[in-house]
Regions:
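Nucleotide/phosphate-binding site architecture used for ATP/NTP-dependent chemistry
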Residues: 2-378
Length: 378
């Protein structure tokens, strides 16, 4: 098995940031500022004032938005169409900002600060939100820096190439690439847009604290044979025996490499020390991160299942963990819903399908469960 979890990136990958340059930074600020104004106006948090009496031949009007700061009042002017359900379509090239009637650069972070009161962003939350916005701009600059594939080529491209080439992320969420917890090297290793090979970490989880669940058509042995193969399974079994552990007392569990290095080795140290969690190494298969960031596609064996793992980074305002209690019931709920859809004549006439989560493994941390009541990032 692969064991090196900390192989450094090349100097070019780890030290240079070619996407952080003035022209690209201005470009992504303009694009995301248009998105922010559109979404916040749609949500009625902001109310741009119409400046023209009649729309032009394309249905656009000019609007202005004023941030009435006492010392430096800022004025944003742009051309936009108001669509059905009060969605806004802003012409990016038209967006212009003045401060004290002097033209100035567009800056999404400064915009958030200027309108924090209208956006109801508290002083406590504001720094975290600004960090998420900055990370989103960082990711956008990375995407705009690379040489993309044409729309014509994408028509016949594989789904994984399409995943890698996606530019927008969540179409409405403004801070949609927050990823607080990733450093620059993590971004290169684990982000969907970087599309690097990722080798999952495999642990043996003791059944006294772990729970495996699956749909009726699967069982644990069948799933592991399919996903790992007989050779790797035999190797894992030998590792457990060498540690005086009975393989029958454990279930095998994939975890995200970032999660292992940054969370599990410390938060679950007691379980590791007492062999309730046993590190087995990295898997041989190469995976690719999907747009949802914690779901992975198997590049080495595409016929194998996607794998979704907990990833305790702050992304889109939420910690991306997975509750072991939710995991215990997820396959059963998915199976019920799948059968419901399959038995619906109308949905089947439209060839409607659902993607099922067919199996799950959860591991409980008894200390945090005793210490915390209600929802928590832990």
């Amino acid at each position: 098995m692969m064991m090196d979890l900390s192989a450094p990136l090349s100097p070019h990958q780890s030290l240079e940031l070619p996407h952080l340059q003035p022209v690209l930074w201005q470009k992504v600020n303009r694009l995301h500022l248009c998105k922010a104004i559109s979404e916040f106006s749609h949500e009625c948090l902001l109310a741009p004032q119409r400046m023209t009496d009649h729309p032009d031949s394309e249905g656009y009007d000019y609007y202005q938005l004023v941030a009435a700061a006492a010392d430096k009042p800022a004025n944003y002017v742009f051309r936009a169409r108001r669509l059905a359900l009060d969605h806004w379509l802003i012409d990016p090239d038209s967006l212009h900002k003045t401060v004290n009637e002097k033209s100035t650069d567009l800056d999404l972070l400064l915009f958030i600060i200027e309108f924090k009161r209208q956006l109801s962003i508290s002083e406590r939350v504001l720094p975290t939100y600004l960090e998420e916005i900055t990370s989103t701009l960082y990711s956008s600059a990375f995407k705009h820096c690379r040489t993309g594939i044409s729309a014509t080529a994408l028509v016949n491209a594989s789904f994984q190439i399409i995943e890698k080439e996606m530019m927008e992320g969540h179409p409405s969420f403004v801070a949609n690439n927050g990823r607080i917890g990733f450093d620059a090297q993590d971004f290169q290793r684990f982000s969907p847009e970087a599309a690097s090979d990722v080798h999952l970490v495999w642990l043996a989880a003791h059944k006294s604290k772990a729970h495996f669940a699956c749909i009726e058509q699967l069982d644990y042995a069948k799933l592991m044979e399919q996903e790992l193969g007989a050779e790797v399974l035999a190797e894992f079994e030998q590792q457990l025996i060498a540690r005086d552990c009975n393989p029958q007392d454990y279930v095998l569990m994939p975890v995200h490499p970032w999660q292992w290095q940054n969370k599990l080795t410390s938060i679950f140290a007691a379980d590791i020390a007492n062999q309730r969690l046993v590190f087995l190494g990295q898997g041989k298969d190469a995976y690719q991160a999907q747009q949802s960031i914690r779901t992975f596609f198997n590049r080495s064996h595409p016929q194998r299942y996607y794998v979704k793992m907990a990833l305790s980074i702050l992304n889109m305002g939420f910690m991306r963990g997975l509750s072991p209690y939710y995991m215990a019931t997820t396959p059963g709920i998915n199976e019920w819903l799948f059968d419901l859809v399959e038995g619906d004549e109308i949905l089947q006439a439209y060839d409607f399908k659902i993607l099922r989560e067919v199996a799950s493994i959860g591991f409980r941390n008894s200390y945090y469960e005793q210490a915390i009541t209600g929802d928590s990032a832990y």
